[in-house]
UniProtKB/Swiss-Prot annotation:
GO cellular component, one term: postsynaptic density membrane
Cystine pairs: 118-128, 146-155, 279-390, 303-349, 519-536, 528-545, 593-634
Gene label: Sema4f
Protein name: Semaphorin-4F
Sema domain segment(s): 48-516
Keyword Glycoprotein (UniProt): yes
Length: 777
């Protein structure tokens, strides 16, 4: 049984029930009071605050075209301040930041003949569209784009100045997947497209290629399971020699993916996250590995989870954080999940490119066919020059001017040994974040300078159910600051891009723009400091939380300790309304306590001598006895500042005093409401009885003329005599079945606290925040 009264709104009201005794006995009561914690320390993987869609909607800007879906391909052009969006059968161009203006649009539809061929191949109608998969900047005047084109991939170019149509169409096989469900990756380097996808209709031939000129002239991976074994590609990134601080090197392209391991460690197919690297100057071999990569090397990515590394089975996404020029090498942030059913684990790990390079320069692995494990190759078995290396100036001095001049023994070795023996460990040796209750799918990151000048990495994590988690990296840990609901309907985040202070999120139904520097939502100094946002600082001059932009005068901020007590002036305390909870039966009462921050540490204060208490995450469970009557208060502390969040007075029903007039008014209103319901019920009952009597007269008349009384009369529906099965509402509220037929609609009369015949948690009338747990009665 559930009955709920609304929480009284702030405003003029009678003086609340005093929670504490007169001052003369206050000290004695405080000494006698006990303190019970609400729950243990909440890990920083739990978002500190959560904004539902009703509150978050004011911080978001949305774009969606009528009858257009799958906004999954996003490309930001910082030079023109433009966001290009690839959707189903359409490509859009929006000016950033967008604010509702009409975008430019190109419709790239599939001809009906192609759609018919698609359906003849056994594909569904909804699959036979052109899903845009690749958007890349080809040069200053043109974009390169590729789409699935009803399971016949096509590529073309777009003149960005006119933005009218896709021109110079050509086959996209080997560049673009055949369907959107196939994971792929693509990146432009030096005006050249590097892709990782599948080449055939069945999706059984994976390929990593440099797609230049005719398809037969491409440089691509060998068709061997030792090179690629059922991969799911995630991302592709380019690092230049300048970013390494190595002027003698070559551009290196990194591909991140998950593939099935060929090592038989168990009877199950083991998925392994990996990184592969090729060199931009690779021309393939002269005889061996013709038109094939001679620099293709790959290594395992290790992101160990709580269950012996099982959290690292599947790589969901990878992003790069590029610092300012000359400020160091980039950093890779990846999202990992478990491949095992029932293990809902997500982990975030950071990887350094120099660690990847060190592994690629380490020992090779060889899979022995007479055993089920790979073994390292001995150093004396590795030919010279070292297989898989980019062509450097030092190699050119040794008469190896390009990969075409490499000896066959080197090419044969790299063909048979593409996998390295050692894994790549995360930058800090362990994950930055591990959670078991959130499925992360996408990640982007940028580096923010705090008020003190120290830099912090801020990550934005998109979830499977359409939420956005904002996290800041403090040392070797990620702290999730905020959970933001993005969409009115639950749907996964499909893509994300950053543009200055704006985050752009693509999903099935829309593109959502999020302001990442919206500090104005933090209304007080304590809220601003506790938010631990490197962008935001409290301005004493403006008496507001603002984006500091490097300004220091009259501002405070504390990212790592959030010490409110030393930075903010003492704010006037708000005394919560004391809710009187009348009880007249033995049972369990749950007194809720909901602090604004999940990281707050809360304790309960209750009368002395009360021992039958059970702290819960949502409040305090009290066994109702005469000795449990008295005052209860939930006090929460964070950042050195404490305040009472909730206060209750537990009394026997007969002890209600005149101070509870507000509840009396609410109760009178509820009584009037239920009396109205009773009157309506009596009216319906009288009408039903009249119809029943009319039905009986009809049956008697039919009986006289020999009619079959078992057959229903014309215009009626036959009902079985079996008892009605419980409805979904009955299953959710088991008391509805047990109490059917008593009171109004099967529920007891209001304000009655009779014992419950079946286990349930019920709301106590007259106590809008309290629940009664009758499981032990």
């Amino acid at each position: 049984m559930l009955a709920r009264a609304e929480r009284p709104r702030p405003g003029p009201r009678p003086p609340p029930v005093s929670l504490f005794p007169p001052p003369s006995s206050l000290l004695l009561l405080l000494l006698a009071m006990l303190s019970a914690p609400v729950c243990g320390r909440v890990p920083r993987s739990v978002p500190r605050t959560s904004l539902p869609i009703s509150e978050a909607d004011s911080y978001l800007t949305r774009f969606a075209a009528p009858h257009t879906y799958n906004y999954s391909a996003l490309l930001v052009d910082p030079a023109s301040h433009t966001l290009y969006v690839g959707a189903r059968d359409s490509i859009f161009a929006l000016t950033l930041p967008f604010s509702g203006e009409k975008p430019r649009r190109i419709d790239w539809m599939v001809p009906e003949t192609h759609r018919q061929n698609c359906r003849k191949k056994g594909k569904k109608e909804d699959e036979c569209h052109n899903f845009i998969q690749i958007l890349a900047i080809a040069n200053a005047s043109h974009l390169l784009t590729c789409g699935t084109f009803a399971f016949d991939p096509k590529c073309g170019v777009i003149d960005v100045s006119s933005f009218q149509q896709v021109e110079r169409l050509e086959s996209g096989r080997g560049k673009c997947p055949f369907e959107p469900a196939q994971r792929s990756a693509a990146v432009m380097a030096g005006g050249v497209l590097y892709t990782a996808t599948v080449k055939n209709f069945l999706g059984t031939e994976p390929i990593i290629s440099r797609a230049v000129g005719r398809a037969e002239d491409w440089i691509r991976t060998e068709t061997l399971s030792s090179w690629l074994n059922a991969p799911a590609f995630v991302a592709a990134m380019v690092l230049s020699p300048a970013e390494w601080g190595d002027e003698d090197g070559d551009d290196e392209i990194f591909f991140f993916f998950t593939e099935t391991s060929r090592v038989l460690d168990s009877y199950e197919r083991i998925k392994v996250p990996r990184v592969a690297r090729v060199c931009a100057g690779d021309l393939g071999g002269r005889k061996t590995l013709q038109q094939r990569w001679t620099t293709f090397l790959k290594a395992d990515l290790l992101c160990p989870g709580p269950e012996h590394g099982r959290a690292s089975g599947v790589l969901q996404d990878m992003t790069e954080l590029r610092p300012q020029p000359g400020a160091g090498t980039p950093l890779f942030y990846g999202i990992f999940s478990s491949q095992w059913e029932g293990a809902a684990i997500s982990a975030v790990c950071a990887f350094r490119p120099q660690d990847i390079r060190a592994v690629l320069n380490g020992p090779f692995r060889e899979l022995k066919h007479d055993c089920n494990r790979g073994l390292p190759v001995m150093d004396n078995e590795v030919p010279q020059p070292r297989p898989g290396e980019c062509i450097t100036n030092n190699m050119k001095f040794q008469q190896f001017g390009s990969s075409l001049s490499l000896p066959d023994r080197v090419l044969t070795f790299i063909r048979d040994h593409p996998l390295m023996d050692r894994p790549v460990f995360p930058a800090d040796g362990r994950p930055l974040l591990v959670t078991t209750d959130t499925a992360y799918l996408r990640v982007v990151a940028h580096r923010v300078t705090s008020l003190s000048g120290k830099e912090y990495d801020v990550l934005y994590l998109g979830t499977e159910d359409g939420h956005l988690h904002r996290a800041v990296r403090i040392g070797a840990q990620l702290s999730v600051l905020e959970d933001l609901a993005l969409f009115p309907e639950t749907q996964p985040v499909e893509s994300m891009k950053l543009y200055h202070d704006w985050l752009l999120v693509g999903s099935h139904t829309e593109v959502t723009q999020v302001n990442t520097s919206n500090c104005g939502r933090l209304q007080s100094c304590s809220e601003c400091i506790l938010a631990q946002d490197p962008v935001c600082a409290w301005s004493f001059r403006l008496d507001a939380c603002v984006a500091h932009a490097g300004e220091h005068r009259g501002m405070v901020q504390d990212i790592e300790s959030a010490d409110v007590s030393s930075l903010c002036p003492k704010e006037p305390g708000e005394h919560p309304v004391v809710f009187e909870v009348p009880v007249a039966t033995v049972g369990h009462v749950v007194l809720p306590c909901s602090p604004s921050s999940a990281w707050a540490s809360c304790v309960w204060h209750q009368p002395s001598g009360v021992t039958s208490l059970t702290p819960r995450r949502d409040g305090l469970e009290v066994v109702v006895t005469p000795g449990a009557m008295g005052a209860y208060a939930c006090e929460c502390q964070e950042g050195g500042a404490a305040r009472v969040v909730a206060a209750y007075s537990l009394v026997w029903g007969s002890q209600r005093g005149p101070a509870n007039r507000a509840h009396t008014v609410v109760g009178a209103g509820l009584v009037g409401f239920f009396l109205g319901v009773l009157a309506a019920s009596l009216t319906l009952l009288l009408i039903g009885r009249r119809q029943q009597r009319r039905r009986q007269r009809e049956l008697l008349a039919r009986d006289k003329v020999g009619l079959d009384l078992g057959a229903p009369p014309s215009g009626t529906t036959s009902y079985s005599q079996d008892p009605p099965s419980p409805s979904p509402e009955d299953e959710r509220l088991p008391l509805a079945l047990g109490k059917r037929g008593s009171g109004f609609g099967g529920f007891p009369p209001p304000f009655l606290l009779d014992s419950c015949p079946s286990p349930a948690h019920i709301r106590l009338t007259g106590a809008p925040l309290a629940t009664c747990d009758e499981t032990s009665i």
